[in-house]
């Protein structure tokens, strides 16, 4: 019995060769910030129905490029390089009725797994050659624009000093330690500089520290 497998996932997923081999179709969310998980689920369900009822034969190809970068210049809105690539890919999908789905993968860079990378997943109706050609083309475009994804960086000291110089509430985002991107979330670099340069500023700093949690659980309310 041949059972079709259709997968929907985050566009920041680590898509492996095994996942491509063991599924009929992989559809990623199209928006970052993530606004369309339910809509992507609907697209996946429709494709599954078409496979079962309309004899659609999905052929999928993923040309992966070894590009790892933060999400700073990778929103799918505005004029980021990733948004431009995504819009171009979606226009390609609209212009070719034989394309069932296109997805652009930007893998979370801190997952720390073998064979990480991103690129275009193309699914066609029984036309692997076209899927391969388009996937390779867009993955090459992605690689060729890699320098555009480099963000402006600040040291923790620079970020804190710049933040405290502004008379407003400030959000400092340490993207390299983002738990949602696969990092541990235990960096105290920003906290250290806040203590050094703004010890009396009211601040909230998130730090993953199970040992500190254990100590707190064993102390009464009001302890320091």
Question: Model-found features: residue ranges?
Answer:
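Active-site histidine-anchored catalytic micro-motif
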Residues: 1-52, 174-188, 195, 199-210
């Amino acid at each position: 019995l041949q059972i079709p497998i259709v997968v929907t996932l985050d566009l920041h997923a680590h898509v492996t060769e095994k996942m491509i081999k063991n599924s009929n179709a992989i559809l990623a969310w199209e928006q970052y910030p993530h606004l369309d998980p339910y809509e992507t689920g609907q697209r996946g369900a429709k494709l599954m129905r078409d496979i079962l009822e309309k004899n659609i034969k999905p052929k999928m190809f993923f040309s992966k490029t070894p590009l790892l970068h933060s999400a700073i210049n990778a929103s799918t809105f505005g004029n980021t390089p990733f948004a431009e690539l995504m819009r171009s890919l979606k226009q390609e999908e609209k212009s070719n009725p034989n394309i069932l789905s296109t997805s652009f993968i930007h893998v979370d860079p801190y997952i720390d797994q073998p064979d990480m990378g991103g690129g275009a997943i193309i699914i066609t109706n029984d036309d692997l050659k076209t899927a391969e050609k388009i996937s390779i083309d867009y993955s090459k475009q992605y690689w060729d624009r890699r320098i555009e994804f480099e963000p402006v960086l600040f040291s923790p000291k620079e970020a804190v000093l710049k933040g405290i110089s502004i008379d407003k509430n400030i959000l400092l985002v340490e993207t390299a330690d983002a738990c949602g991107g696969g990092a541990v979330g235990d960096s105290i670099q920003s906290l250290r500089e806040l203590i050094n340069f703004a010890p009396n500023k009211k601040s909230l700093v998130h730090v993953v520290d199970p040992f500190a949690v254990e100590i707190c659980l064993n102390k009464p309310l009001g302890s320091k």
